[in-house]
Amino acid sequence: MSKSEAEYRQDIIDVGKLIYQKGWVAANDGNISFRLDANRILCTCTGISKGMMKPDDLIVCDLDGNKIEGSRERTSEIAMHLTIYQMRPDVRSVAHAHPPVATGFAVAGRPLTLALLPEVIIGLGCVPLADYGLPGTPALTAGMLPYIPKYDAILMRNHGLVCYGEDVYQAFFKMETVEHFARITLVAELLGGPKVLPKEEVGKLFDSRTRYGVKSRTPMEPGRPVVAEDVEQCKERLELTRDELIALVDEALRLRGVLT
């Protein structure tokens, strides 16, 4: 059953509060939108905390970003939302924020593409990293274009995370999944490095999508993650004896003036 516009507005307000309470945005960060119909987008305004919005603060604009309704100014990153809607007819909501751990990976230039968690593989595949683009300009979206058709969550280099889905809550839950995945990945790295699932197991997880009601556009989509076999192919094993290792360390220390 379809909701009223007032209910969709309240969904954005409620999710705005959630991302603020979780610490995924600070001050006026972030933006959320919802596709009302074929010609109208409901979106957050600029210059306001996403945890302190009211329904009347939201803006209605057309598919060119022109304001149709609202007393405030629409988000400066509306072009990113519109591009996603244009490229993905199945998407009805887009959420952008700066969840700290996921954004830390983006700042470090690290995509979240390893096949580690069944829930992430089934629901998202993996999370790629888009090239940096100046916020509020077309360059922001340019680096995302190769990923939008295949992925439902994209890390934005030195910026944050964008997620999208069939409604506001689905976009929010995907963002929550990515941040949770980033935290687990970070802990695994601190504990000696994550153990990546092999291709066969990842294939089984992709095959199980239908059972869990996850939509997939093509086999092994969205976003095939990096499997154990990929990692092994990238490894270059270096073997040293104890004496060779000591000599190598001594040489490095002498070059830095630590030893004479």
Q: Over which residues does each language-model region extend?
A:
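Glycine-rich flexible loops
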Residues: 1-260
